[in-house]
Design a protein with these regions (language model features):
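Primarily short, surface-exposed interaction patches in extracytoplasmic proteins
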Residues: 1-219, 246-251, 264, 270-327, ...
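Globin-like tetrapyrrole-binding proteins
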Residues: 330
Length: 344
């Protein structure tokens, strides 16, 4: 009996330790290197066929791709050779394509309007010399994206106004703004709308790496959200997020009643308005005007104009609803404004 009792006790301890084990890491299909020597590849069905070596189109360059294996690594060196071949200084495409994509990201449209087609069927760049300059900067700076980002956002073109009499005259002459004579007003992307709404409430989880989750169940940034092609994310889908089934070099920008319903009546946006109101109320010593100024700073990055502050103060003081309902309504209005949704 003593031995049996000891056995049961050990089993219970073992079960307790098993319960403390972390869950197994998720698995995914992957590939591994075959070693420094790659298997020979030849055309099937041909006897005594010579092995085919990696290379470009033989009609353009009959020489095989130079491959220098690294004896210190268990790899053939073929992928490294391909990467060097693609990013070679003699290949003008990668630097131009990348510079054009960055320009499109900051200005709403690329210098070349067909970002995935730089061939004869694509649209020629509106400013070829500028595109060449940006591509050269990218190469000369060792492919530093940070340097190119800095050049674009500190340029005179990026710092132009998007409103005013001069802008109106420019819009009449150049409606599509191909000559970059003004800054184009653009709406935030689906991911930016979601992250901005979570960020101003103080809920955004800015941790790097790690597991993500569904949009409505996690406060992590949108870059970490789970993407399922057969199960669209309602929060992002309403603002034209790509479906993940096909490449989309230029996103569609639509204005639909569904977006208004989501922003005004959607439960997710109402939760963000309540969270923003709680954040404003967390500073119990702040005055009403200070809370209004904080709300404007969080939502718009500026302080309210005197007329705006007076209107909000009048609304909050005249409200006869109990609790913080009026403050929640005010926060809801901030989240539904064009100034919150658009970059101008």
């Amino acid at each position: 009996d003593a031995a049996k009792e000891k056995w049961e006790k050990l089993r219970a301890e073992l079960a307790a330790l098993e319960a403390e084990k972390p869950p197994p890491l998720p698995c995914a299909p992957s590939v591994t290197d075959v070693g420094p020597l790659a298997p020979e590849v030849s055309i099937p069905g041909r006897r005594n066929a010579e092995p085919i070596e990696p290379g470009g189109l033989s009609v353009l360059d009959p020489n095989p791709l130079p491959i220098v294996p690294n004896p210190s690594q268990q790899t053939t060196g073929r992928r490294t050779a391909l990467a060097h071949w693609i990013t070679s200084d003699t290949n003008p495409l990668p630097s131009r394509v990348l510079a054009n994509r960055l320009w499109q990201h900051h200005f709403g449209r690329g210098l070349a309007e067909s970002p995935s087609d730089f061939g004869r069927l694509g649209e020629p760049p509106s400013h070829p010399e500028l595109l060449d300059y940006l591509a050269s900067e990218l190469l000369d700076r060792g492919w530093s994206l940070k340097h190119l980002h800095r050049q674009m956002v500190t340029s005179a073109a990026y710092r132009q106004a998007s409103h005013g009499p001069e802008v109106t005259a420019s819009a009449q002459k150049d409606p599509l703004n191909k000559f970059v004579a003004r800054m184009t007003v653009r709406r935030l992307s689906a991911e930016q709308v979601r992250d901005a709404a979570v960020a101003i409430t103080g809920e955004l989880d800015t941790r790097m790496a790690g597991p993500g989750g569904d949009s409505g169940k996690t406060a992590r940034r949108a870059v970490y959200l789970k993407v399922q092609r057969n199960s669209r994310d309602a929060t992002l889908d309403v603002f034209d997020v790509p479906d993940g089934l096909a490449s989309m070099p230029v996103r569609n920008i639509t204005t639909t009643p569904t977006q208004s319903l989501f922003m005004i009546n959607g439960p997710w946006m109402m939760l963000r308005a309540k969270a923003l109101a709680r954040r404003l109320e967390s500073n119990s010593s702040a005055t009403l005007d200070e809370r209004v100024a904080t709300a404007y700073r969080l939502a718009y990055g500026r302080v309210p104009r005197p007329d705006e502050a007076a209107a909000v103060r009048q609304f909050l003081q005249a409200s006869d609803t109990g609790g913080n309902a009026a403050l929640v309504d005010f926060c809801h209005v901030l989240l539904n404004s064009s100034e919150f949704l658009y970059v101008d």
